[in-house]
Amino acid sequence: MSRGHQTQEVRRVRTPRRGEIPGVVEQIMGHGKLKVRCADGHIRLGRIPGKMKKRIWIREGDVVLVKPWEFQSEEKADIVWRYTRTESNWLERKGYLKL
């Protein structure tokens, strides 16, 4: 393989499932917590689960997928997925992301 050619892996974009809402990270609070503006209009305190903490780095402005808690569903949620720039552009074009 020559130096100038890179192969790109084609993979499917994870779409929101039942009970999951896309959102944009507004602020990093520390200790694995984020302030997320969700597509349904609520601002939730998002928690990064332990299995994602060390593997995925989340910054302000990133598009994430959150799953609201059973109780306090309008205030708190768990972060389920972080989208890349190209994935978030695709979601916006297809109408999944309305922010």
From Swiss-Prot:
Sorted alphabetically, the keyword list is: Initiation factor, Protein biosynthesis
**What name appears for this protein in its UniProt entry?**
Translation initiation factor 1A
Describe the family membership recorded for this protein in Swiss-Prot or TrEMBL: Belongs to the eIF-1A family.
- Native organism is Methanothermobacter thermautotrophicus (strain ATCC 29096 / DSM 1053 / JCM 10044 / NBRC 100330 / Delta H) (Methanobacterium thermoautotrophicum)
- Per UniProt, residues of the S1-like domain are 11-84
Q: Does the keyword Protein biosynthesis apply?
A: yes
* Lineage, broadest ranks: Archaea, Methanobacteriati, Methanobacteriota, Methanomada group, Methanobacteria
As for what it does, the entry says: Seems to be required for maximal rate of protein biosynthesis. Enhances ribosome dissociation into subunits and stabilizes the binding of the initiator Met-tRNA(I) to 40 S ribosomal subunits.
The record's listing under Pfam families reads: eIF-1a (PF01176)
Q: Name one GO molecular function term.
A: RNA binding
Keyword GTP-binding tagged: no
